[in-house]
Amino acid sequence: MRTIRRVVLLLWVMEEGKFRELLEQNYTWPALYMFKFICPANNEAVAKLEQLFDPEVAELSLRPSSKGNYVSFTAKELMISVDAVIERYRLATDIPGLISL
């Protein structure tokens, strides 16, 4: 499992430059940013994902998949910078089974 996480982190670092460039080109900061994730439908994964966002600041939406195995998670939040968005995605990489969209 640790090897998989290292590979994912390595890919993340390689792609971060492209992602940063797209964010800088398409947003004027601060900006309302929409995060989208799919995670396993277990309480631990959902709770960890929810902890990344303050419900008083972010608009959160959860929707279970048709078979109930996964949860679609959307969060809209006013983000101050590109770095803040990237840091939030970095924190999310610690959640097992999480897919960032």
Name what the model sees in each region.
Residues 2-72, 78-101:
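Long, contiguous binding/interaction regions
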